[in-house]
Amino acid sequence: MKKLILLLAGICMVFPATAQKKNFTYKFYGFVRGDLFYNTRVNMAPVDGNFYLYPLDKRPDADGKDLNAGPNGSFYTFTSRLGVDVTGPDIGTARSSAKIEVDFGGFSSSTTMLRIRQAYVALDWEKSQILIGQTWHPLFGSVCPDILNLSTGAPFQPFNREPQMRYQYKVEDVKLTASALWQLQYLSSGPNGMSEEYIKNSCVPEFYVGADYASASGWLTGGGVHLISLKPRTSSVWNEKTYKVNERMTALSYEAHVKYTGRHFTFAAKSLLASCLDHTALIGGYGISSIDPDNGEQEYTPFRHSTSWINFTCGTKWKGHFFAGYTKNLGTADVLVSATEYGMGLDIDQVFSTNIAFSYNLPHWQIGMEYMPTTAWYV
């Protein structure tokens, strides 16, 4: 499957304005963005087709013709963005700040709606920071691909913003991060589809701990561990009777990343051993490993996926971008006893994608084109 995108991003910072009130500073920002895209095949692409992930499998009709072989495309501007950064008064020895950022990527049945991207408050000390609110998931992190596509490297690069409580501590060139996160817009899969009920009923947030090392020579390296614990069901219908059940699916994921920033070029890479990270736009999910014959209570096992990507950029005014990503389905730790599975792309054995892009950049403006061939091998 091939995808072509023309990015007409008038990254015109529509509000690069600063306003002041006693002990407060407000900096407004934003941009108008347009995405024109053409796909040679039907694909998995949320956000009304604007967030490309991977091509769908063949779907033959009565004559054996592939129903997913047709092209599609459109033009959207709903990822245009508005935001405000607020610097507040000192609270003791801490500097206070806040951010609110929105776009128009929320959807009802027929229209786009204003959507919160980030909304948080933060307290900064000399070596530490506490952040409370919604911002980028720590697996998105400080290392992500520099490409034009809205998906920003997904399904190889985690893409997610969640409500969270985050603590960071910096010692010289090392920054430590610990986060507790809850789901809102990006949701895990389960018996009732994508829903926040699985983590809500779990009463256990997602947890992440990680470390980054940044050198004066331009290198950034780091890694982290992520835990998710879901309750897929609280009741079971078994032999025409309803039973209360105590089910839980817990999974660990691991990631490592590196980035080098030179004067006119960058190199970045990330690799994950991912389990149950479908809510971060990665391929993943879980299946059923056992069923209690008395009440239908189930145990679960996560699918494990190895996913990696690399990214190069060169230039500033005229900029070249290259990206390559690969995901491999490693199966489950325990044998599945049911064909029922919950997640995204679990019928895919492996996916490989490349992305070649060029952009022309001026102050407050960017225009670019990219070509992205992607191949998915289905089981």
Language-model features, listed with the residues they occupy:
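Bacterial Sec-dependent N-terminal signal peptides
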Residues: M1-K21
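Outer membrane beta-barrel
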Residues: K21-D48, R59-Y186, C203-V204, Y208-A216, ...
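Outer-membrane beta-barrel proteins
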Residues: N39-N43, S109-T111, G141-P145, Q185-G190, ...
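Surface-exposed loop/turn segments flanking beta-strands in extracellular/periplasmic regions
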Residues: V47-D61, S289-N295
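Extracellular loop and loop/strand-boundary signature of outer-membrane beta-barrel proteins
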Residues: L67-G70, G105, L148-G153, S188-E197, ...
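Membrane-spanning beta-strands of outer-membrane beta-barrel proteins
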Residues: T77, L114, N160, V204-E206, ...
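Detector for outer-membrane/organellar transmembrane beta-barrel domains
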Residues: A216-I348
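Predominantly the C-terminal beta-signal and adjacent terminal strand-loop region
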Residues: L362-V379
